[in-house]
Regions:
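Short, conserved loop/helix-junction motifs that constitute active-site signature segments
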Residues: 170-171
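N-terminal leader/linker segments that precede catalytic domains of diphosphate-processing enzymes
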Residues: 1-94, 98-165, 182, 187-208
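Conserved cytochrome P450 K-helix/beta-meander segment immediately N-terminal to the heme-binding cysteine loop
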Residues: 176-178
Length: 208
């Protein structure tokens, strides 16, 4: 009898690799309309790390609106930023942060994009994960984060050998969690929040 968990994991990993390689449609026009990258001065990278839950499946296991490769055990690593931070306090986020000068030199030495170096370094610092178990699949297009003056590169990763993670520094993070992807895709858990900054009100995705 085939191992359906391994098969689903392989399908998910292959789909993510195709996304990173530009073989799947990925529309970001709506995310680019607020500020072009040329107007922003700082660079950052985040690690979008997918894996397979070790213990319990998604609470949305019965939700039928997912692609076949999004099994009930597929998860993504997220954190909640500390409430005392100057920017994006208390917000959920991917592990990551500003690209440091030494990241550029290390990227040059290894012959890889600098976003990979920075995203993995920050993820280790924030969550304590073992980088040896992470397979970097590639990068998605750099996105503007005008509110904090950053150009952010999402780095796609596959957690081939998951390790224990948790809050490393309470001044940086309040929570580290592996969140089932099906829960994020389930419309019952998805909402729209309205954030007002000055005279402008922005719509943003929100999750229950």
């Amino acid at each position: 009898m085939p191992n359906t968990l391994n098969t689903a994991a392989e399908q998910a990993r292959d789909a993510l690799a195709n996304l990173a390689a530009g073989k799947l449609d990925f529309k970001i026009d709506s995310l680019m309309r607020y500020a072009p990258n040329s107007m922003l001065s700082k660079e950052a990278a985040v690690l979008v790390l997918f894996g397979v839950l070790d213990d319990e499946p998604s609470a949305s296991a019965d939700f039928q609106g997912c692609p076949d490769y999004v099994g009930e055990n597929l998860d993504v690593l997220l954190l909640v930023r500390a409430g005392t931070l100057r920017s994006h306090a208390g917000q959920p986020a991917f592990p990551g942060g500003k690209i440091d000068p030494e990241d550029y030199e290390l990227a040059r030495q290894q012959g890889v994009p600098v976003g990979r170096i920075a995203a993995l370094r920050e993820a280790v610092e924030e969550t304590g994960l073992d980088p040896a178990g992470v397979e970097i699949l590639g990068e998605l297009p750099t996105l503007p984060l005008a509110v904090s003056d950053f150009r952010v590169t999402p780095v796609l990763g596959w957690w081939a050998s998951p390790t224990r993670v948790g809050v490393v520094d309470t001044n940086e993070s309040a929570l580290i969690a592996r969140v089932p992807v099906r829960d994020l895709l389930n419309p019952a858990n998805r909402h729209t929040a309205y954030v007002k900054r000055g005279r402008i009100t922005h719509k943003t995705p929100a999750f229950e």
